[in-house]
Swiss-Prot record:
Source organism superkingdom: Bacteria
Alphabetized GO MF terms: glycine hydroxymethyltransferase activity; pyridoxal phosphate binding
Positions of post-translational N6-(pyridoxal phosphate)lysine modification: 226
Keyword Amino-acid biosynthesis on entry: yes
Function of the molecule: Catalyzes the reversible interconversion of serine and glycine with tetrahydrofolate (THF) serving as the one-carbon carrier. This reaction serves as the major source of one-carbon groups required for the biosynthesis of purines, thymidylate, methionine, and other important biomolecules. Also exhibits THF-independent aldolase activity toward beta-hydroxyamino acids, producing glycine and aldehydes, via a retro-aldol mechanism.
Pathway note: One-carbon metabolism; tetrahydrofolate interconversion; Amino-acid biosynthesis; glycine biosynthesis; glycine from L-serine: step 1/1
Name the record gives this protein: Serine hydroxymethyltransferase
Subunit structure: Homodimer.
Binding site for (6S)-5,6,7,8-tetrahydrofolate: 117, 121-123, 241, 349-351
Originating organism: Geotalea uraniireducens (strain Rf4) (Geobacter uraniireducens)
Signal peptide (residue range): none
Compartments, as annotated in UniProt: Cytoplasm
Family of the protein in this entry: Belongs to the SHMT family.
EC class of the enzyme, as a word: transferase
Length: 415
């Protein structure tokens, strides 16, 4: 037995059950992924014990020479990975990364243009329940009704009308390529700063499979998990002219001591992302997404914007008898994990929704390929055709478990 199993069997058992879920269920939540053993080892290291307020070479605590090495490695690797002038790897999350940029550029009450959460944006892009919507004057932009892609004409019209101090670009449920150059061109007409939140697509950007926002934005924020496949956390890239102000808005602005064990794990993940095989892996994520999208369409499902260019897709259930909530719960019983998600112009509440969001990063990490995605589409269809049939859902779960056992990832942790 492990030390944890001996001392706290309740926590140890919950961890084991979650390991089994990640190993044998099909994880299709677009924002989730599975880290490598190297990342996990760094995350669970003795660096968790070290306070290191400040930055490398300028700490408020002694004994930081070793963690300075780690943070400098993370910074330099991040800059190399994305071609950025400056990187701050201390944000605990993507939301805190975004908050730091807001506070670097804006004063309370300033006007910000951000993507409507209901159209695929993020809470931190101006939702009224979030700090961004409470502290700043938010003007939302969205997608067109015709093809559910970003309405760049609306972006320009709203920008010229409201003259925002900052334009926030990026999304949490948008399946198409984003034209960062178009946002830059519009922003320059009113002297606005551009912040791109590339949390969902950072891995694709690193691999050259999605245009990079770095040349077009003063600030680029991201999480370090999702497609990037690192530990849970955040990061900010910016132009050198903003480095000092940005750093001070992270510490002491909104955070105290950085999580050095998480920063070590980020450094490891960035090294993994710099390796040639990472591009192959990201290519497979996109191939799998396109194959799954095609498979779902073949099964009769409707996708917003008609498909996907990246790692995710949004299934539109508005013309069926299902809600996103019912679909999520049924799929969970079938061993398939997705999340209910609003679709553009949704008439249902965010707690019910008319869609589900599906992504391929975690399944790709397990080793699934395009042919498996066709099988996944059939499994999803079978489950959603039998949402009230517990026997059928259990049968689908058996098929899911059998498939996933062919693609072990953490099986050694269950031995």
């Amino acid at each position: 037995m492990s030390i944890l199993e001996t001392f706290d069997p309740a926590v140890a058992n919950a961890i084991r059950l979650e390991t089994e879920r990640q190993e044998y269920n099909l994880e299709l939540i677009a924002s989730e992924n599975f880290v490598s053993e190297a990342v996990m080892e760094a995350q669970g290291s003795v660096l968790t014990n070290k306070y290191a307020e400040g930055y490398p070479g300028k700490r408020y605590y002694g004994g930081c020479h070793n963690v300075d090495i780690v943070e400098n490695l993370a910074i330099e690797r991040a800059k190399e990975l994305f071609g950025a002038e400056h990187a701050n790897v201390q944000p605990h999350s993507g939301s805190q990364a975004n908050m730091a940029v807001y506070f670097t550029v804006l004063k309370p009450g300033d006007t910000v243009l951000g993507m409507n959460l209901a159209h695929g944006g993020h809470l931190t892009h101006g939702s009224p329940v979030n700090f961004s919507g409470k502290f700043f004057n938010i003007v939302p932009y969205g997608v067109t009704r015709e093809n559910q892609t970003i309405d760049y004409d609306e972006v320009e019209r709203l920008t010229l009308e409201h003259k925002p101090k900052m334009i926030v670009v990026g999304a949490s449920a948008y399946p198409r390529i984003i034209d960062f150059a178009a946002f830059r061109k519009v922003a320059d007409k009113v002297g606005a700063v551009v912040m791109v939140d590339m949390a969902h697509i950072a891995g694709l950007v690193a691999a050259g499979l999605h245009p990079s926002p770095v040349p077009h934005a003063e600030f680029v924020t991201t999480t370090t998990h999702k497609t990037l496949r690192g530990p849970r956390g955040g990061m900010i890239l910016c132009r050198e002219e903003f480095a000092k102000a940005l750093n001070s808005n992270i510490f002491p602005g909104i955070q105290g001591g950085p999580l050095m064990h998480a920063i070590a794990a980020k450094a490891v993940a960035f090294k993994e992302a710099l390796a040639p095989e990472f591009k192959t892996y990201q290519e497979q994520i996109v191939k799998n997404a396109k194959a799954l999208a095609a498979g779902l369409v073949k099964q009769g499902f409707k996708l917003t914007s008609g498909g996907t260019d990246n790692h995710l897709m949004l299934v539109d259930l508005s013309e069926t008898q299902l809600t996103g909530k019912v679909a999520e719960e049924a799929l969970d019983k079938a061993g398939i994990t997705v999340n209910k998600n609003g679709i553009p112009f949704d008439t249902r509440s965010p707690f019910i929704t008319s869609g589900i969001r599906i992504g391929t990063p975690a399944a790709t990490t397990h080793g699934l390929k395009e042919a498996n995605m066709e099988e996944v589409a059939v499994l999803i269809a079978d489950a959603l055709a039998n949402v009230e049939n517990e026997t059928k859902l259990a049968e689908v779960k058996g098929r899911v478990n059998a498939m996933m056992k062919r693609f072990p990832l953490y099986a050694h942790r269950l031995a």
